[in-house]
Amino acid sequence: MRNPAKQEDLIKAFKALLKEEKFSSQGEIVLALQEEGFENINQSKVSRMLTKFGAVRTRNAKMEMVYCLPAELGVPTTSSPLKNLVLDVDYNDSVVVINTSPGAAQLIARLLDSLGKAEGILGSIAGDDTIFTTPARGFTVKQLHEAILRLFEQEL
């Protein structure tokens, strides 16, 4: 049976390491955790933890691709701190453009795509900090823009 205190220590250490923004591979994270006393850690466990905590790869200040946590996130919901990662929402005649904090665009796009056509979203394309979203049939770009603003409680 797992020791809950040990598991909690592992999670704290894992999050602290990712906040350093210097690990470019899962293997490097495994080695760092082993150095901190977590002997039974392996690459598959690190991979599951990266997924569970919504870690993304982004460029650090040295322009290196590293793993980081965009925010304290579990499963993305519109009431979670995820909305704090949305910096701006604008639109033109074709698409709604959403600007996010670096590394957060794919997570936000995943949430939008999960809402789907019923909410007016045909699909999204995400880069590192920008998302293009297009409206589903029967919705205007302006309606989609307003729906996204409401979703993330932004000002109109």
UniProtKB/Swiss-Prot annotation:
Tree of life domain: Bacteria
Cited Gene3D superfamilies: 3.30.1360.40, Winged helix-like DNA-binding domain superfamily/Winged helix DNA-binding domain
Family: Belongs to the ArgR family.
Pathway(s) per entry: Amino-acid biosynthesis; L-arginine biosynthesis [regulation]
PANTHER family: ARGININE REPRESSOR
NCBIfam families named among the record's database cross-references: argR_whole (TIGR01529), PRK05066.1 (NF003457)
Protein name in UniProt: Arginine repressor
Organism phylogeny: Bacteria, Pseudomonadati, Pseudomonadota, Gammaproteobacteria, Enterobacterales
Subcellular location(s) of the protein: Cytoplasm
Organism: Yersinia pestis
GO BP field: L-arginine biosynthetic process; protein complex oligomerization; regulation of arginine biosynthetic process; regulation of arginine metabolic process
InterPro entries assigned to the protein according to its UniProt record, in alphabetical order: Arg_repress (IPR001669), Arg_repress_C (IPR020899), Arg_repress_C_sf (IPR036251), Arg_repress_DNA-bd (IPR020900), WH-like_DNA-bd_sf (IPR036388), WH_DNA-bd_sf (IPR036390)
GO terms for MF: arginine binding; cis-regulatory region sequence-specific DNA binding; DNA-binding transcription factor activity
Any Gene Ontology CC annotation: cytoplasm
Function: Regulates arginine biosynthesis genes.
Chief location of this protein within or outside the cell: cytoplasm
Keyword terms, alphabetized: Amino-acid biosynthesis, Arginine biosynthesis, Cytoplasm, DNA-binding, Repressor, Transcription, Transcription regulation
